[in-house]
Structure formats: C-alpha cells, structure tokens
C-alpha cells in the first residue's frame, strides 16, 4: 500500500514512517502543505496521513480541496487539538478518521489497517506465491497451510519482495523501506533478514543478484 505522510514534526514523522514501513507499506513523507498538495497532484496514494497544523498550507485546507476535487483518497487526520469541535471540523471536512497526539504507534498502525479495509469495502488482497501466503490484514504468513512466525522486519521485507515479484530490489532500496534514514543500521542487516527468511521459508524463494540486490521470481502460471 502506498501512503502519503504529511507531518512537519521531524521526530514524529520519522517514527511514523518507520512504523508504517514495518507494516510493509511504501511511505512518501513530506513536511509542509504545499509539498503534500504537489504530491497528491503528481502521484496516486492509497491513504493520506495528514497533520492538521502543517506550515505553508493547513491540513484542513488540503483536505477540503481534496474533497472539492472529488478525490476519495482515505484520510487519517493527526492533530494536537483534542476539543470536540476540532474533531467535528476535521470529520466534516472529509476526514475518514481522526487521531489525537500523542498516540501509540500500534494504534496508528491498527487504524490504518482498519481504514483501508473499511474504505475499500473488502479485506486487503493476500499475496500468494505457490504454497506461501501472506495476509496484509492480519499479518499472518503461512507455508503449505502452516503458520510461520516472522519478526516485524522479516515480515516487512517479505511483503515488499512479494509485492515486487519479478523485480530485483537493491540493498539500498530495501534498507530505505525498512529503516528510513536511521543511521544505526548494521551494514549486513538486509543479509541477516534474508538469511532468516530463507531458514524459515526455504532457500529457493529469495534470489540473490550479486552486486545488485534481492528478488522473488514471479510464480509459474
């Protein structure tokens, strides 16, 4: 799922982006309202996580303009304002859900999953590769019908590779998706996650392209 995050608090924004990427989502992060509007014009997103108090253009203005144009992109509003009138204003402007700061990252992740299911009217499609199944809605992974326990970043890496089956993703792309701009990433972190996935799912699933990165081949028809 592709998510646009519009949040000007750098510490909070980095944490949200990292948390959503652990869910296997692709996140584009902007820090002001004008950049958010430009991103919405030039690209398509499955969800907008929108802070109300953005510089240059407020989140409510962006939301009203979005709905005025007839765009139905689901919107989760973030705000430090906790008065009922503020929540009503956000929802009346077209928001699908509302989260007041400070909040727990687990709650944000759960609201994003629920909002996506609710607005699409169906569960998120499962990712299937032979006997391997990954359910984005429940985070369950099964192999030949048996549940497989994965660590959060193992799950995020597997989902990313399955969503891009047939492609080769570089180590830098994978690090950016899983860790963002965090500076404390071990140089062999991706290799370690791949090793663990191969141990749990078999050596043939993830292909190494030396000097480039990793990929999962498209399943045979």
Curated annotation (Swiss-Prot):
Gene3D superfamilies: 3.40.50.2300, 6.10.250.690, Winged helix-like DNA-binding domain superfamily/Winged helix DNA-binding domain
Disruption phenotype: Deletion leads to transcriptional alteration of multiple genes including a large number of genes involved in metal transport, such as the feoAB operon involved in ferrous iron uptake and the mgtE and mgtA operons involved in Mg(2+) transport.
Alphabetic keyword roster: Cytoplasm, DNA-binding, Phosphoprotein, Transcription, Transcription regulation, Two-component regulatory system
Function: Member of the two-component regulatory system PmrA/PmrB that plays a role in the regulation of resistance towards polymyxin B and cationic antimicrobial peptides in response to limiting concentrations of Mg(2+). Functions as a transcriptional activator by direct binding to a cis-acting sequence upstream of the target gene promoters including lipase lipA and pmrH promoters. Also autoregulates its own pmrAB operon under Mg(2+)-limiting conditions.
Database matches in InterPro entries: CheY-like_superfamily, OmpR/PhoB-type_DNA-bd, Sig_transdc_resp-reg_C-effctor, Sig_transdc_resp-reg_receiver, WalR-like, WH-like_DNA-bd_sf
DNA-binding region: 124-218
Xref: Pfam families: Response_reg, Trans_reg_C
Location relative to the cell: Cytoplasm
Stated name of the protein: Response regulator protein PmrA
GO terms for MF: phosphorelay response regulator activity; transcription cis-regulatory region binding
SUPFAM superfamilies: C-terminal effector domain of the bipartite response regulators, CheY-like
Gene induction: By cationic antimicrobial peptides and by Mg(2+)-limiting conditions.
Domain Response regulatory: 2-116
Source taxon at top rank: Bacteria
4-aspartylphosphate, modified sites: 51
GO cellular component: cytosol; protein-DNA complex
One BP term from GO: regulation of DNA-templated transcription
């Amino acid at each position: 799922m592709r998510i646009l995050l519009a949040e000007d608090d750098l510490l909070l924004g980095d944490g949200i982006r990292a948390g959503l990427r652990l869910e296997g989502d692709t996140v584009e992060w902007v820090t002001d309202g004008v950049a958010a509007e430009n991103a919405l014009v030039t690209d398509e997103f499955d969800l907008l996580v929108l802070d109300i108090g953005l510089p240059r253009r407020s989140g409510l203005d962006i939301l009203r303009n979005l709905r005025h144009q007839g765009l139905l992109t689901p919107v989760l509003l973030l705000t430090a304002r906790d008065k009922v009138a503020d929540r009503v204003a956000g929802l009346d402007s077209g928001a699908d859900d509302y989260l007041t700061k400070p909040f727990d990252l687990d709650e944000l992740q759960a609201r994003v999953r629920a909002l996506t299911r609710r607005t699409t009217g169906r569960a998120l499609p499962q990712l299937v590769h032979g006997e391997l199944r990954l359910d984005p809605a429940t985070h369950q992974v099964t192999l030949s019908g048996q549940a497989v326990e994965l660590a959060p970043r193992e799950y995020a890496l597997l989902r990313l590779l399955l969503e891009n089956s047939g492609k080769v993703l570089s180590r830098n792309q994978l690090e950016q998706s899983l860790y963002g701009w965090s500076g404390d990433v071990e140089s062999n972190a991706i290799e370690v996650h791949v090793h663990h996935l191969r141990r749990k799912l078999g050596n043939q699933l993830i292909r190494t392209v030396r000097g480039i990165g990793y990929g999962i081949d498209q399943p045979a028809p």
